[in-house]
Amino acid sequence: MNRITALPLSLPLALLLALSACKEEGAASAIPPPIELTEEAAGHYCQMIILEHEGPKAQVHVAGYPDPFWFPQVRDGLAFLKSPEQLGEILVVYVNDMGAARSWADPGEGNWIRARDAFFVVGSDAKGGMGAPEIVPFATREGAEAFALEHGGKVMTLDEIPVDAVLSPIDLTSSTTDTTDTLKTEITE
């Protein structure tokens, strides 16, 4: 093959490679970053001001919506993942890292971690901002284990969380959970 015929063949190949690299870069940038919690953030279900509630929070980013859906409890955010109300493709879910929180009353405005990467304590004595049993997120397994030692519960990843822990009616007198069925979520992360 001479140089003259090789050039026209190599040019389309180079363009295809460049376009595929752009497409991959665009897909990676489609995941929105966490939004810092502000005084205007209202709960998706309750429309109450999120900052007025203690405990960890969740923000769920859904394709086609410019702002995240806010939840005053992580449990509520995880329930949204499996609810029939789910409005579309979930791009990413962020939760407060309680290992970086100032206190239970003040979990922080900017210490967000991806739910997919978090370790959760399920079935502890912790109550969330709405008074229901809370599913408590941590960036590290060690942080979650330390919390579980003090408050009870079991350390789990997102996919290990029991369906009953997020979708069953809330018993405000008990924090036990049935771990027979696990929550499988579809998040585009």
Spans of features found by a protein language model:
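Positively charged n-region of N-terminal signal peptides that target proteins for export
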Residues: M1-T5
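Bacterial N-terminal signal peptides
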Residues: P8-S20
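Bacterial signal peptide processing site
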Residues: C22-E25
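Short, intrinsically disordered, charge-biased short linear motifs at domain edges
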Residues: A27-I35
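Post-signal-peptide N-terminal segment of Sec-exported extracytoplasmic proteins
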Residues: I35-W70, R75
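Mid-length scaffold segments of soluble, non-membrane domains
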Residues: D67-D106, N111-W112
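Beta-strand-rich cores of mature extracytoplasmic or soluble domains
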Residues: A105-E160
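C-terminal partner/receptor-binding element of secreted or periplasmic proteins
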Residues: A139-E189
